[in-house]
Amino acid sequence: MAAAAATPRLEAPEPMPSYAQMLQRSWASALAAAQGCGDCGWGLARRGLAEHAHLAAPELLLAVLCALGWTALRWAATTHIFRPLAKRCRLQPRDAARLPESAWKLLFYLACWSYCAYLLLGTSYPFFHDPPSVFYDWRSGMAVPWDIAVAYLLQGSFYCHSIYATVYMDSWRKDSVVMLVHHVVTLLLIASSYAFRYHNVGLLVFFLHDVSDVQLEFTKLNIYFKARGGAYHRLHGLVANLGCLSFCFCWFWFRLYWFPLKVLYATCHCSLQSVPDIPYYFFFNILLLLLMVMNIYWFLYIVAFAAKVLTGQMRELEDLREYDTLEAQTAKPCKAEKPLRNGLVKDKLF
């Protein structure tokens, strides 16, 4: 795998479009692509897969081994670090049970987002400031730069682990089924975009999605720690409130503003300008649009959360996502537990 960055262009980056421009140009490009595809069908799909998909068996094996490694590492961290920490800090039982999951996800998303931010903002890759450049010089079977390949290995193996973890390790929640769909779609996007060498746009998607998960898990940890050892800790409560506001803002800005205007505009419209016969155009854009739909779905939880706060129905941060079915049927919280109704709105991302 090569380490060379994308070839720089002398032209000034194209200004980011408005929502209306993005929708109009993307629809026109997609319609033209559909009308010009005379041989679209399973035959073309099979030929495109055979000619343009490059994913070696050793790469798949390495991803599976890393997924097993994530699972083992999470178990070890939960057993030897997170649970003893919760016990030492004298967290409420419900909070102590949820701390390992949030702590684990915070560490992963913080590390991966920091790495992706470094690649996009600290190196010569122009993809964040010039999203159409993700398709400049694209070639079928081109070498993947080693630093982007590392990001793909981390993310792909983690989402493979996350499918297992959602079913067998995480608390079951209202949107866990949607979360499973999200993980499957994300893993399919990661594997296929790597195979078809759309890794540049994948790096941008990683960056735009992981930042909100960092804030979510950090905020949830402060919610768990704000009432511990029989006392209320105002600092953690303040940080949780500020983190909630920051999370809501970043969710909209990164996933509902930048994601469609940078990523979807580049994949739906600009891709055909750079590579008129780009393979699997509709397949990838349908998956990315499905990801956008799920982002909007979770944003509805955020709106419901904000509405409860603004109307005074909620005096403490309450989890609109987290719930345990058995606990909901049997548990009756005591007075000391009421200020600890915790959580936020959503749990991750591509």
UniProtKB/Swiss-Prot annotation:
Protein name: Ceramide synthase 1
Induction: Up-regulated in skeletal muscle in response to high-fat diet.
Pathway(s) the chain acts in: Lipid metabolism; sphingolipid metabolism
Top EC class, one word: transferase
Membrane topology of this protein: Multi-pass membrane protein
Tissue note: Expressed in brain, skeletal muscle, heart and perigonadal white adipose tissue.
Principal place of residence: endoplasmic reticulum
EC number(s) reported in the record: 2.3.1.299
Effect of A266D: In toppler (to) mice; impairs ceramide synthase activity
UniProt keyword Phosphoprotein, yes or no: no
Disorder association: Defects in CERS1 cause cerebellar ataxia and Purkinje cell degeneration. Two mouse strains flincher (fln) and toppler (to) carry spontaneous recessive mutations at the TLC domain of CERS1, resulting in complete loss of the catalytic activity associated with a reduction in sphingolipid biosynthesis and accumulation of lipofuscin in many brain regions.
Organism for this UniProt entry: Mus musculus (Mouse)
Sequence intervals crossing the membrane: 53-73, 103-123, 148-168, 176-196, 239-259, 287-307
Molecular function as annotated in GO: N-acyltransferase activity; sphingosine N-acyltransferase activity
Subcellular location: Endoplasmic reticulum membrane
Chain's role: Ceramide synthase that catalyzes the transfer of the acyl chain from acyl-CoA to a sphingoid base, with high selectivity toward stearoyl-CoA (octadecanoyl-CoA; C18:0-CoA). N-acylates sphinganine and sphingosine bases to form dihydroceramides and ceramides in de novo synthesis and salvage pathways, respectively. Plays a predominant role in skeletal muscle in regulating C18 ceramide and dihydroceramide levels with an impact on whole-body glucose metabolism and insulin sensitivity.
Record domain TLC: where: 97-311
PTM annotation: Acetylated. Deacetylation by SIRT3 increases enzyme activity and promotes mitochondrial ceramide accumulation.
One Gene Ontology biological process: positive regulation of mitophagy
Modified residues (N-acetylalanine): A2
Listed GO CC annotations: endoplasmic reticulum; endoplasmic reticulum membrane; intracellular membrane-bounded organelle
Other comment: This protein is produced by a bicistronic gene which also produces the GDF1 protein from a non-overlapping reading frame.
Keyword annotations from UniProtKB, A to Z: Acetylation, Endoplasmic reticulum, Lipid biosynthesis, Lipid metabolism, Membrane, Transferase, Transmembrane, Transmembrane helix
Activation/inhibition comment: Inhibited by fumonisin B1.
Reaction(s) catalysed by this chain's protein: a sphingoid base + octadecanoyl-CoA = an N-octadecanoyl-sphingoid base + CoA + H(+); sphinganine + octadecanoyl-CoA = N-(octadecanoyl)-sphinganine + CoA + H(+); hexadecasphinganine + octadecanoyl-CoA = N-octadecanoylhexadecasphinganine + CoA + H(+); sphing-4-enine + octadecanoyl-CoA = N-octadecanoylsphing-4-enine + CoA + H(+)
